[in-house]
Amino acid sequence: MLSPKKVKHRKVQKGRMQGVARRGGVLNFGQFGLQALECGFVTNRQIEAARIAMTRHVKRGGKIWIRIFPDKPFTKKPAEVRMGKGKGAPEGWVAVIKPGRILYEMDGVSYELAAEALRLAAHKLPIKTKIVARS
């Protein structure tokens, strides 16, 4: 699972996701990619599940780049605990995604194989995405 080695603050505020991605919106490594169409949080488990789905479909062919990293901790209170009494304990890590951000890139495979692998990966993610190709 992806997670930061060291963080300055153990707990952070949720923040707001407004506007579109300023960076990371073009294909830098591969020929094909998966681009976000809406904003949201993607957990480290979802990133890993999508990566596994892609690699299993292409059967060790081609190369895959993960363009996002979960650097924001999210907290969760235990089950059946009343409201209040402070913020919960850190539960995991999320990547903040804005529209236009490239999530994954692929190269070394045909368009049909890449499109199907990226479609399988998109089903593992909680946001709407589209498949893009280098023109």
Swiss-Prot record:
Q: Which InterPro entries match?
A: Ribosomal_uL16, Ribosomal_uL16_bact-type, Ribosomal_uL16_CS, Ribosomal_uL16_dom, Ribosomal_uL16_sf
Encoded by which gene? rplP
UniProt keyword annotation of Ribonucleoprotein present? yes
- Stretches of the chain forming a coiled coil according to its record: none
Name the SUPFAM superfamilies for this protein.
Ribosomal protein L16p/L10e
Q: Which family does it belong to?
A: Belongs to the universal ribosomal protein uL16 family.
Q: What is this protein called?
A: Large ribosomal subunit protein uL16
Assembly and partners are described as:
Part of the 50S ribosomal subunit.
Domain of life, per lineage: Bacteria
Any one of the GO CC terms? cytosolic large ribosomal subunit
- CDD domains found in the cross-reference section: Ribosomal_L16_L10e
* GO MF annotation terms: rRNA binding; structural constituent of ribosome; tRNA binding
* Key words, A-Z: Ribonucleoprotein, Ribosomal protein, RNA-binding, rRNA-binding, tRNA-binding
Q: Which residues form the signal peptide?
A: none
Q: What GO biological process terms are annotated to this protein in UniProt?
A: translation
Among Gene3D superfamilies, the record links this protein to: Ribosomal protein L10e/L16
Organism per entry: Desulfatibacillum aliphaticivorans
Functionally, this protein is described as follows: Binds 23S rRNA and is also seen to make contacts with the A and possibly P site tRNAs.
